C-alpha cells in the first residue's frame, strides 16, 4: 500500500469517526485542537486505525500521535 493510499484511508476514517468534512483535514491538523476530538474520539480513532491497517499501536506510541501526518507516518513505518 502506498503512502497516498494510506493517507486516503486515514482521511476516510477521520471523516467517519469524527464527523468532519474531508476538506477540513490537512496533514498538520491536530486531532484535538483542529478537528475537535476529545480523548474518547482519539482512542476510537486509534482502534479503527489498528483494525483497518492490521497494526498494533501501543499506548505509549498512541500518545505521540497528535496530528494526521503523525498517524500516516506511523502506519507507513509498520
UniProtKB/Swiss-Prot annotation:
UniProt KW keywords: Cytoplasm, Fatty acid biosynthesis, Fatty acid metabolism, Lipid biosynthesis, Lipid metabolism, Phosphopantetheine, Phosphoprotein
Keyword Cytoplasm listed: yes
Protein name: Acyl carrier protein
PTM annotation, UniProt: 4'-phosphopantetheine is transferred from CoA to a specific serine of apo-ACP by AcpS. This modification is essential for activity because fatty acids are bound in thioester linkage to the sulfhydryl of the prosthetic group.
Subcellular location: Cytoplasm
Residues of the Carrier domain: 4-78
Any one GO molecular-function label of the UniProt entry: acyl carrier activity
Keyword Ribonucleoprotein: no
Annotated family: Belongs to the acyl carrier protein (ACP) family.
Role, per record: Carrier of the growing fatty acid chain in fatty acid biosynthesis.
One Gene Ontology cellular component annotation held by this UniProt entry: membrane
Classification of source organism: Bacteria, Pseudomonadati, Chlorobiota, Chlorobiia, Chlorobiales
Predominant place of localization: cytoplasm
Amino acid at each position: 500500500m502506498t503512502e497516498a493510499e494510506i493517507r486516503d484511508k486515514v482521511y476516510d476514517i477521520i471523516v467517519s469517526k469524527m464527523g468532519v468534512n474531508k476538506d477540513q483535514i490537512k496533514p498538520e491538523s491536530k486531532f484535538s485542537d483542529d478537528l475537535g476530538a476529545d480523548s474518547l474520539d482519539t482512542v476510537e480513532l486509534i482502534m479503527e486505525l489498528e483494525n483497518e491497517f492490521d497494526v498494533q499501536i501501543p499506548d505509549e506510541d498512541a500518545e505521540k500521535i497528535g496530528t494526521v501526518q503523525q498517524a500516516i507516518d506511523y502506519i507507513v513505518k509498520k
